[in-house]
Amino acid sequence: MLEKINADIVSAMKEHDTLKLSTLRLLKGAVDLERINKRVDKLNDDNIIAIIAKQIKTRKESIVEFERGNRQDLIDKTNSEIEILSAYMPEQISEEELSNIIEQAIKEVNATTIKDMGSVMKIVSSKVKGRADMQQVSSIIKNKLN
């Protein structure tokens, strides 16, 4: 995955695509920082996907602030950055499939109350790893357990 990011940085430089270039450089910086913090030579794809998801999440939070400040230019730029980063994420799971996985997990642990949410989340997160927004997963589980 890191090789693909590096190759895309080179192609963005050749195409003079400044937005893509800056977004990918920020991503590469975040990956390098995480690699240094973990004291490893190379991160695996799961770690890189987690970093990308974190980058997307922070940009979505920024959009909320930009909307409050009526900054359409920054909203558009940030949405474009999210699109660039999303290209590196695994294909997102459909709501129907996610709902089925949650139902199976609830049955698996015999969850009946909201107190069982942690054990359900543990099972679901291992199955959907990086393919679903965990806030969405959490809200669906809450609805099903209430």
Model-derived features: positions:
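N-terminal cationic and glycine-rich segments that engage phosphates or anionic surfaces
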Residues: L2-Y88, Q92-E103, K107-E108, T112-I114, ...
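Key DNA-contact positions within bacterial/archaeal DNA-binding proteins
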Residues: Q135
